[in-house]
A protein has these predicted regions:
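Acidic, mature catalytic/reactive cores of soluble proteins
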Residues: 1-172
């Protein structure tokens, strides 16, 4: 859902807006897909943006980052991994992209919007070693759910799952 106080024009698959701002003008554009209501004005948009930013700052401050010249890079990497976590289930997406070829112009395309068990484990181990263990705990719950451990029916783990725990056949890879 696209919400704004600008006049939007739709051109094919694109939404465009033009305006000339003068000092004191306030505009906002919000793109959302949440069940929560989108902001309806500049003040609501600014408040939501501030709260989101503050939430991310609080999360990164939980971590135990070494006093190292690369500390900022470790923090940025941790934030990137956190952004790939699907919080309703604890699944970690391999990436936020889809259909990237294994080689340029190649036929083998991989969809990285799934949770690949091996890759997720390595990534979450990184967060765990930085003291950000909640995400690892949530992922273990995700694994327990998809393996049937929570209802007593154990299933062998697949290579990957949908972020909601959906079983993915090889045709989707």
């Amino acid at each position: 859902r696209l919400t704004t106080n600008l006049r939007i024009g739709l051109e094919g698959h694109e939404a465009r807006a033009r305006t000339r701002l003068t000092e004191g003008d306030k505009v906002f554009v919000a793109l959302s897909w949440s069940k929560h209501p989108a902001p309806q004005n500049f003040e609501e948009a600014a408040d939501k943006m501030w709260k989101t930013s503050e939430s991310w700052r609080q999360w990164i401050n939980i971590g135990d980052f070494p006093d190292h010249p690369w500390r900022a890079y470790l923090q940025r990497s941790a934030l990137t991994l956190k952004g790939l976590v699907y919080s309703p289930t604890g699944a970690l997406l391999a990436a936020s992209s889809t259909s990237l070829p294994e080689t340029p112009q190649g036929e083998r395309n991989w969809d990285y919007r799934y949770s690949w068990i091996r890759d997720s484990t390595f990534a979450l181990w990184g967060l765990y070693t930085l003291g950000l263990d909640r995400e690892a705990d949530d992922f273990f719950s995700f694994i327990a759910d998809v393996s049937g451990a929570t209802n007593g029916e154990r299933h062998p783990l697949q290579v990957m799952y949908g972020v909601g725990g959906e079983q993915i056949g090889r045709a989707h890879v």
